């Protein structure tokens, strides 16, 4: 220990700890911490691991539900009962800062890490989704980031053998230097095969399994807990390096090891590596049984590089590693399974009953820390920051009169916007059909759906967030993120079940950012309570800022929602696109129309306006129930919600998103409003709570009857045609298209915007 640097306040501050936190550490230990102990505390008390600036707010979210098998934060991921002795494990997490400095590996290891969280619970990953944000595609650096992130996600997922079935991608200037890479994994497990991330049972051996430990990723958790800057490029060593083929072996070996019954507890080594897995598993054991702890000997840890210090071994975030607590006397069964798969499994310590995390290296005790003092809910600090509302300084749009506009040209221009245009270039790089459970190709249903083999059921899943709405109105925007996710799932015929979230915000020490965070969480909570979709867990990513106009600017607040839903009978699945000519087109929902927050307003007037669209959560809940009922009774042939771009874009997407079955439409919108901008609002408003369905003409009466029962306005606005597309308002044509015109505008605009030929 004498070779370690002298620990003092200055060194602690260099590790991201403040004076008060350093004093608390000294008080807990009753002495000055060793250098290794300082490193352990610095990562465990970082924002990334401790949630110290967010946990007080997160505790206000609904976390109870009849179908939940674990509460938020109890385990590596949420666990939801779906009947037939099956449960869904699912979670979403961010890998933003690593992807900003090393996009390929940053994104790839984000995929690997979230899948490990799922299979360490005993579940087999069956699908993944993503939610991505980048700056303007005009920026060469942004194009480099997009290319690296998309390839990283695709290469890791394809090699690992889990389909990437859905996601979203948006472009806004505020993400130029700070992209967001949020990845969600979904897995299935039989109830009796689940595993807890808990260390208990004095004398039970502790094993490290998987890849050897190197110097990659050291202080990755701390890196994720600070602002990005030009100097962040120097922190490429903080970005881990992934190996999907090693993870595939680790997956199969782990599920087989669990089947032996010899595994007591299991946790992924993600952020903070060996430090977080030992301390968190110890703390859970203490909480559940009253005593626990772990003692390890780092000399037994397989190291990738010579001369690694205790500090480096404890803080390394080398990928494809896990910590296992085995039943004493049966560890050889686990080791034999991993050996069969050519995966390392080594006993490095044991469970104790003195409530300590004890680390030995070269015959010395280099760390001896009360385990609960390290973790969220234990000794880790909790802060409530100042929150001050700061209204966006975006001007209201000065709308021009409808009669001066070319609505055909505007509609085609809107379809070619990167935020709306086809994302085929992205999802064609992902294998969405591996495992043969995916029901429809990407983009043909409002939420991805996979079949649950051995049953008639389907599992729907979606990620959603319109960050612009949250920027304009954090509370309403947070609620809309949940509402649209649930609406998308209900459009497939599935009932929304539960939520995981990934909360991406700026610096929490800035009062206006903390206000955005608190308000968005309040909106999310309101929506989840209304829909009975509890929060099962997730991730908070602060310190997301970019350099714009010579200063530091926070990203748009982006509380990404990941949601799952259950389709009782896969035969009742409803697709997004028109199914057959002659069907009636019905618009469900009739909110007051506004252009605030819309893509059209940004495109045409250079401002998002002054507020988000309004959201009526009671209406949304009834709309979800209606859609599920209509699907179960087979009364509708398609359903697609009205969102980005408004009704004109929704109709176009229903026409062209299925390239093998493109159909047209004739729509006539009734409008009693006499104002001179009514047509713009009819076509391009992103007012919430609306869905366009197509229905056999003979079933329209039954559909309207069901809608009336739930107080959902519904009216026929047109019909599906074999070819051509037209929109009229009050009988007056305002836009007519050939299907090929819609497809040309929508189909390859993203590739053109990204100048892919230059990559």
From Swiss-Prot:
Q: What is its main location?
A: cytoplasm
Question: Broadest EC class?
Answer: ligase
UniProtKB keywords: ATP-binding, Cytoplasm, Ligase, Magnesium, Metal-binding, Nucleotide-binding, Purine biosynthesis
Q: GO terms for CC?
A: cytoplasm
Enzyme Commission code: 6.3.5.3
Query: Do you know which CDD domains this protein is assigned to?
Result: PurL_repeat1 (cd02203), PurL_repeat2 (cd02204)
Task: List the active-site residues.
Answer: 48, 95
- Pathway it acts in? Purine metabolism; IMP biosynthesis via de novo pathway; 5-amino-1-(5-phospho-D-ribosyl)imidazole from N(2)-formyl-N(1)-(5-phospho-D-ribosyl)glycinamide: step 1/2
Q: Which GO BP terms sit in this record?
A: 'de novo' IMP biosynthetic process
Q: Where does ATP bind?
A: 51, 91, 501, 538
Q: Which residues bind Mg(2+) 1?
A: 93, 539
Q: Which InterPro entries match?
A: PRibForGlyAmidine_synth_PurL, PurL_linker, PurM-like_C_dom, PurM-like_C_sf, PurM-like_N, PurM-like_N_sf
Give residues annotated as binding Mg(2+) 2. Answer: 117, 268
A Pfam family name for this chain? FGAR-AT_linker
**Can you say where in the cell this protein is located?**
Cytoplasm
Sorted alphabetically, which SUPFAM superfamilies does this protein's record hold?
A: PurM C-terminal domain-like, PurM N-terminal domain-like
Question: So what does this one do?
Answer: Part of the phosphoribosylformylglycinamidine synthase complex involved in the purines biosynthetic pathway. Catalyzes the ATP-dependent conversion of formylglycinamide ribonucleotide (FGAR) and glutamine to yield formylglycinamidine ribonucleotide (FGAM) and glutamate. The FGAM synthase complex is composed of three subunits. PurQ produces an ammonia molecule by converting glutamine to glutamate. PurL transfers the ammonia molecule to FGAR to form FGAM in an ATP-dependent manner.
Q: Which PANTHER family match?
A: PHOSPHORIBOSYLFORMYLGLYCINAMIDINE SYNTHASE SUBUNIT PURL (PTHR43555:SF1)
Kindly give the HAMAP family that the UniProt entry links to this protein: PurL_2
Subunit structure and binding partners: Monomer. Part of the FGAM synthase complex composed of 1 PurL, 1 PurQ and 2 PurS subunits.
Give the family this protein belongs to, as stated in its UniProt record: Belongs to the FGAMS family.
Q: What is this protein called?
A: Phosphoribosylformylglycinamidine synthase subunit PurL
- What species is given as this protein's source? Chlorobaculum tepidum (strain ATCC 49652 / DSM 12025 / NBRC 103806 / TLS)
The UniProt gene name for this protein comes to purL
């Amino acid at each position: 220990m004498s070779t370690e640097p002298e620990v003092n306040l200055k060194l602690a501050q260099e590790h991201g700890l403040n004076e008060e936190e350093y004093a608390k550490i000294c008080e807990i230990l009753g002495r000055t911490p060793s250098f290794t102990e300082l490193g352990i505390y610095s990562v465990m008390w970082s924002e990334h691991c401790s949630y110290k600036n967010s946990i007080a707010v997160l505790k206000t979210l609904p976390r109870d539900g009849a179908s939940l098998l674990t509460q938020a934060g109890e385990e590596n991921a949420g666990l939801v009962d779906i009947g037939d002795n099956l449960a869904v494990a699912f979670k979403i997490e961010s890998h933003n800062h690593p992807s900003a400095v090393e996009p390929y590996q940053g994104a790839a290891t984000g995929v690997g890490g979230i899948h490990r969280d799922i299979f360490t619970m005993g579940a087999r990953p069956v699908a993944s989704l993503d939610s991505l944000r980048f700056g303007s595609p005009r920026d060469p650096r942004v194009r480099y980031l997009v290319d690296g992130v998309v390839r990283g996600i695709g290469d890791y997922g394809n090699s690992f053998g889990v389909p990437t079935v859905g996601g979203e991608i948006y472009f806004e200037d505020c993400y130029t230097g700070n992209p967001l890479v949020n990845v969600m994994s979904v897995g299935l497990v039989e109830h009796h095969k689940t595993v807890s991330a808990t260390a208990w049972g004095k004398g039970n051996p502790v094993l490290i399994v998987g890849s050897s430990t190197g110097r990659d990723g050291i202080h990755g958790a701390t890196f994720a807990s600070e602002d990005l800057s030009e100097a962040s490029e120097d922190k490429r060593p903080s970005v881990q390096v992934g190996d999907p083929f090693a993870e595939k072996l680790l997956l199969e070996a782990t599920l087989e090891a669990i089947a032996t019954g010899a595994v007591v507890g299991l946790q992924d080594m993600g952020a903070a590596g060996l430090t977080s897995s030992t301390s968190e598993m110890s703390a859970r054991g203490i909480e559940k049984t009253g005593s626990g702890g772990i003692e390890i000997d780092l000399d037994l840890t397989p190291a990738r590089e010579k001369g690694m210090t205790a500090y480096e071994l404890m803080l390394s975030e080398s990928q494809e590693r896990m910590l296992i607590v085995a039943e004493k006397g049966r560890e050889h069964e686990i080791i034999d399974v991993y050996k069969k798969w050519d995966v390392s499994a080594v006993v490095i310590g044991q469970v104790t009953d003195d409530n300590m995390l004890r680390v030995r290296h070269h015959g010395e005790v280099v760390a001896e820390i009360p385990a609960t003092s390290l973790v969220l809910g234990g000794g880790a600090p909790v802060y409530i920051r100042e929150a001050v509302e700061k209204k966006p300084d975006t001007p209201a749009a000065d709308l021009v009169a409808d009669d001066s506009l070319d609505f055909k040209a505007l509609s085609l221009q809107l379809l070619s916007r990167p935020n709306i245009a086809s994302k085929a270039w992205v999802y064609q790089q992902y294998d969405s059909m591996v495992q043969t459970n995916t029901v429809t190709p990407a983009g043909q249903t409002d939420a991805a759906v996979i079949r649950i083999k051995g049953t008639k059921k389907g599992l729907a899943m979606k990620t959603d967030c319109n960050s612009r709405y949250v920027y304009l109105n954090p509370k309403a925007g947070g609620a809309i993120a949940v509402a649209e996710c649930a609406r998308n799932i209900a459009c497939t015929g599935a009932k929304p079940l539960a939520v995981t979230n990934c909360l991406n915000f700026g610096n929490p020490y800035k009062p206006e950012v903390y206000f955005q965070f608190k308000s968005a969480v309040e909106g999310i909570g309101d929506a989840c309570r209304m829909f009975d979709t509890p929060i099962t867990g997730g991730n908070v990513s602060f310190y997301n800022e970019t350099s714009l106009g010579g200063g530091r600017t926070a990203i748009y607040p982006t509380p990404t929602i990941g949601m799952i839903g259950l389709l009782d009978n896969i035969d009742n699945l409803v697709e997004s696109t028109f199914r057959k000519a002659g069907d009636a087109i019905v618009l469900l929902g009739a909110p007051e129309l506004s252009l605030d927050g819309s893509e059209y307003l940004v495109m045409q007037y250079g401002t998002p306006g002054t507020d988000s669209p309004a959201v009526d959560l009671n209406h949304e809940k009834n709309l979800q129930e209606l859609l599920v009922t209509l699907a179960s009774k087979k009364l509708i042939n398609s359903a697609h919600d009205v969102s980005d771009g408004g009704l004109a874009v929704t109709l176009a997407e229903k026409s062209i998103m299925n390239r093998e079955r493109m159909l047209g439409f004739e729509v006539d919108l009734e409008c009693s409003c006499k104002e001179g901008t009514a047509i713009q609002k009819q076509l391009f408003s992103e007012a919430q709570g609306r869905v366009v369905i197509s229905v056999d003409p003979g079933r329209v009466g039954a559909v309207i009857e069901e809608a009336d029962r739930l107080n959902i306005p519904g009216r026929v606005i047109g019909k599906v045609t074999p070819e051509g597309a037209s929109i009229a308002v009050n009988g007056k044509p305002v836009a007519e298209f050939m299907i090929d015109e819609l497809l040309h505008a929508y189909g390859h605009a993203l590739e053109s915007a990204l100048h892919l030929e230059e990559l």
